[in-house]
Amino acid sequence: PRFRGTARLGAAVQLVMLRATGRHPDAFSGLPSVLLRYLTSALGMHATDIASVTSLYKDKDTRYEHQLWARERVGFAVVDDTTKPLLADALGELSASAVSVDDLIQQSEHWLFDRRLVLPGDRTLRDMARTAFAEQENAAIAAVRTCASPKQVQAALSHAFSKRSGPGGHTVLEWLRTPP
């Protein structure tokens, strides 16, 4: 076996979390205790054999080695200088149907997982999604300004922010944002 003792647990955690979520476990605040109990049992260990999963990774080289092994085992790659432009292009396309930055992030996570790319950190993905969403919004605003007169734009805005008749007293815009 490549890993011995408690190192097997670290490698197993990396493998299971990457395969299940597309992220390395250090991207999470913690591991579910049920998962940890299952893995220690499956490996013939006791949960008390380790103080914590973080104690396995006092040495960063060990964590890197486990992450690399898990990526190779499940066929995932990291987002790098080659794949980042592809992700940016995908975000541009996905932003046309996204209703918010959070929605775009969720769509991009699926896109990455489908292509077997490790999901980057939240900040990286959020910054890229925010940029793509803003570009889409700016294109939509430019299209409206090209096709509608200032008077028509003002009338549409007035209607969108007007109170809707009926219960709740919401604006038309709030009503439109409410899921069915």
Indicate residue ranges for each PLM-predicted region.
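Long amphipathic alpha-helical coiled-coil/heptad-repeat bundle
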Residues: P1-P180
